[in-house]
Amino acid sequence: LQTPSILKLAAMYRNGTSLQTLVDHLLYVQKIEAGMIKLRISKVDIVVLAKQITDPFHELAETEGINFTVESLNEPLLLWIDVEKISSAIRNLLSNAFKYTSPNGKVIFKMNRIEIDGYSFCSIIISDTGKGIPEELRGRIFESFITGENTPLFSNKVGIGLRIVKNTMDLHHGTVNLDSTLGKGSTFTLLIPEGNAHFCRGPV
């Protein structure tokens, strides 16, 4: 029975849960930037991991009427990473892509192995045909509080989530870059270095 009181309580619960998630993310960002978060590094086939991450999004794509394409590698690519954190970063970007893409739009996940200045990287590109990001926000998109404007295109959760993605890539000595056109979509590119020489000899 959906009485007004029950509906009000349900709304309060959702808002409270959302606020707690926001606070948890903020505290996590503060811990990362204070050097309190340590990586749990293991050698992983990123091709297998990517399939595990992207597979559930095919069902979401069907439900939302979005064309979801995955272009991966045909052979293993071993990386030294914190599986939980890298997985979370990729899911965050994919979730945002679906969130801001309308039915009949496209989301593309593409993985490659590339070389830059003699160094090998895993390149993960997540692009969409969504709303795009306003030009005035692009230069500070990875800051925690860029969305105080609360525009219809963005929310505080997205701003903090992207900050966590940026921090995760920093911890892995990688990069995350954005290319976006308002009204046409966005492309996020992750570059994760191969090998483990870039990590400190001490605990990470």
Residue ranges and their predicted role:
Residues 40-45, 62, 67-77, 114:
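Conserved catalytic submotifs in the C-terminal HATPase_c
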